[in-house]
């Protein structure tokens, strides 16, 4: 399957988890990718896998902090120049931290906002001119089931993801007549490095978390499952999908 042959794709969070899995999925389907991440070691692992797969010739890596405006302006500009245009932006980068809300510091709150919400905004703002130039640009943003359903100890994180959903709806409407599609994936119950280490409080009430198990009874899904959904949404197979979010949670929330 070569759904991304001739397509140029910029992916944040490409050094781990779902972002990394998406890099490899797009490369496997013929796309040309610039992967960015704040974690240089993670990007090296992405390159090692691409080299083993024989797709490294279509992959460019850049270390980038998406919460740094100047770095994003320079980084997106360089990525568009390297690719020769831009067809798809996947905003997979993000951080997950848990806390009792009454113990959440302003620094904690601001860090989550800076990376998850502001980072998504900055990347999208800088990528939009190139995405609009082709007339069929796609933005795939990352929300979470926590944006819609109660996830204890995740108030700050959930607020950022709810903001991303609203942001996605707004840009989907604003640029629809210019051919842009904007969609959200809302993963839940995914086995990734981020979800495995959320830093839950020491006195966490595990009974509150029990309801977050997948209904399918298959355990948590891997990052590759979400990457497959992203590939569908970003390709022509998702051509009639915009301004919405798709939950990927194994039926946890039905």
Language-model regions, residue ranges each:
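C-terminal substrate-recognition "lid" of short-chain dehydrogenase/reductases
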Residues: 121, 219-248, 253
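Active-site helix of classical SDR
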Residues: 124, 160
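Alpha-helical segment proximal to the catalytic Tyr-Lys
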Residues: 129, 173-177, 239
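Substrate-binding pocket helix/loop in short-chain dehydrogenase/reductase
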Residues: 100-101, 105-113, 210-211
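Residue(s) in the substrate-gating loop at a strand-loop-helix junction
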Residues: 144
């Amino acid at each position: 399957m070569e759904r991304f042959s001739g397509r140029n794709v910029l992916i944040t969070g490409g050094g781990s988890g779902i972002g990394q899995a998406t890099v490899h999925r797009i490369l496997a389907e013929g796309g040309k990718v610039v992967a960015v991440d704040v974690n240089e070691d993670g990007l090296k692992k992405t390159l090692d896998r691409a080299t083993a797969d024989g797709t490294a010739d279509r992959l460019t890596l850049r270390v980038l902090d998406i919460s740094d405006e100047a770095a994003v302006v320079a980084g997106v500009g360089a990525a568009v120049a390297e690719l020769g245009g831009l067809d798809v932006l996947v905003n997979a980068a993000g951080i997950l931290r848990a806390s009792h809300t009454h113990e959440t510091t302003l620094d904690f709150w601001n860090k989550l906002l800076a990376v998850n919400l502001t980072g998504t905004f900055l990347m999208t703002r800088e990528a939009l001119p190139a995405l609009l130039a082709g007339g069929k640009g796609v933005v795939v943003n990352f929300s979470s089931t926590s944006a819609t359903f109660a996830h204890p100890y995740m108030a700050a994180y959930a607020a950022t993801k709810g903001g991303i959903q609203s942001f996605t709806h707004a840009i989907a409407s604003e640029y629809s007549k210019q051919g842009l599609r904007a969609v959200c994936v809302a993963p839940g119950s995914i086995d990734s490095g981020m979800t495995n280490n959320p830093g839950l409080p020491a006195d966490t009430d595990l009974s509150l978390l029990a309801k977050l198990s997948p209904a399918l009874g298959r355990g948590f899904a891997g990052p590759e499952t979400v990457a497959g959904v992203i590939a569908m949404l970003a390709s022509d197979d998702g051509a009639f999908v915009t301004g919405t979010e798709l939950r990927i949670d194994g039926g946890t929330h039905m």
